[in-house]
């Protein structure tokens, strides 16, 4: 029997890579999409799968539309990737972030509990829940201390998933994913901001790159690797929570160096520090310990940061040269 999966946030970076993986595994893939005037499906087109997905109208803020999508798709698996996922924007849109990233998870879990209790559920949690770090490396037992409305909303989504698993016996797992990037990353995220700027500077269309805290350290991986961990979680007999990370941390400054060196430039000639890009509360270091995911799921990242950044720079060079 063909397995069916419902993916929220299917037009985002992770949703597109996950949809491609599921299609390759023979799934029938349903995507929850809100009606938007702007073109939101460009990532699915980039991967050549836009026409292979069954789209369901819905909005995570609207419980009724979420219920309709679950009933119509009759999925064996639901992957909740829908989110207002940019930390910086959550300071300007704290209520919207809370509704979508927090309350929206409850809408989906409640729909599964009522109408499809055998469905397996994946919740996209985030390393931003750790925030003000309480340990050198963060694992599944590290205390949470979120430092942004985004982190707080995601923590609600994480704990309501645990609550429904323990209270109602749902097969509901959370992946606590550390930063993961790709050529499909939104331009508002620092990695794409850097690789896009590198391409424009190399092609003579931009003179400088302005950033905030370049000493912040992040554990960066490739989104295409990380969606495999999501799928593996829902293939386990027992639902659980897993940190998904590389276990290696790099500063924003060093990431800039990798990107500029790929096109034969010195980042110090172009990087300018701009106080406007500093946040009200910064998370200085995020470093994940993926030992549990490696042990239980057999998952390991396959793409190094150097390979990832080079891949992104090359993609942006192609994009910018076509403009």
UniProtKB/Swiss-Prot annotation:
Residues in the active site?
Answer: 126, 128 (nucleophile), 150 (nucleophile)
Q: Does the keyword Transferase apply?
A: no
Organism superkingdom: Bacteria
Q: Name one GO molecular function term.
A: GDP-mannose 4,6-dehydratase activity
* Reactions that this protein is recorded to catalyse: GDP-alpha-D-mannose = GDP-4-dehydro-alpha-D-rhamnose + H2O
Biological process (GO) annotations held by this record are: 'de novo' GDP-L-fucose biosynthetic process; GDP-D-rhamnose biosynthetic process; lipopolysaccharide biosynthetic process; O antigen biosynthetic process
Keywords noted in UniProt: Lipopolysaccharide biosynthesis, Lyase, NADP
Q: Please tell me which top-level EC class this enzyme sits in.
A: lyase
Q: Which residues bind NADP(+)?
A: 11-14, 36, 59-60, 81-85, 154, 180, 185
Cross-referenced InterPro entries: GDP_Man_deHydtase (IPR006368), NAD(P)-bd_dom (IPR016040), NAD(P)-bd_dom_sf (IPR036291)
Record keywords: Lyase included?
yes
Needed cofactors: NADP(+)
Q: What is its EC number?
A: 4.2.1.47
Family statement:
Belongs to the NAD(P)-dependent epimerase/dehydratase family. GDP-mannose 4,6-dehydratase subfamily.
- Relate the protein's function as given in its record: Catalyzes the conversion of GDP-D-mannose to GDP-4-dehydro-6-deoxy-D-mannose.
* Quaternary structure annotation from Swiss-Prot or TrEMBL: Homotetramer.
Can you say what this protein is called?
GDP-mannose 4,6-dehydratase
